[in-house]
Amino acid sequence: MSSGGLLLLLGLLTLWEVLTPVSSKDRPNFCHLPHDTGPCKRNTQAFYYNPVYHTCLKFIYSGCEGNANNFKTIDECKRTCAT
């Protein structure tokens, strides 16, 4: 392979690395849990990480139980699971 071809390959690999989302193995395991509204009656807005869409989404939380994939703010969700 010529040096020009190697440089092109190196550039493409670098671009791929920058544009590829963070690997799921770098996230806490609870980020992969489905959102869980819980059994109570207090409907409040919360956020959860959706691993299919690689983003944090809003859901209605009942105020008790549920699971750890439950954040009060979208920023907290992003800091924990989306980075």
UniProtKB/Swiss-Prot annotation:
This is Kunitz-type serine protease inhibitor superbin-4. Belongs to the venom Kunitz-type family. It holds the Pfam family Kunitz_BPTI. Serine protease inhibitor. PANTHER family: BPTI_KUNITZ INHIBITOR DOMAIN-CONTAINING PROTEIN (PTHR10083:SF383), KUNITZ-TYPE PROTEASE INHIBITOR-RELATED (PTHR10083). InterPro entries: Kunitz_BPTI (IPR002223), Kunitz_BPTI_sf (IPR036880), Prtase_inh_Kunz-CS (IPR020901), TFPI/VKTCI-like (IPR050098). Its main location: secreted. Residues 31-81 form the BPTI/Kunitz inhibitor domain. Keywords: Disulfide bond, Protease inhibitor, Secreted, Serine protease inhibitor, Signal. PROSITE patterns: BPTI_KUNITZ_1 (PS00280), BPTI_KUNITZ_2 (PS50279). Expressed by the venom gland. Disulfide bonds join 31-81, 40-64, 56-77. The record marks 41-42 as: Reactive bond for trypsin. Residues 1-24 form the signal peptide. It is found in: Secreted. GO terms for cellular component: extracellular space. The keyword NAD does not apply. It comes from the Eukaryota. GO terms for molecular function: serine-type endopeptidase inhibitor activity. The lineage of its organism: Eukaryota, Metazoa, Chordata, Craniata, Vertebrata.
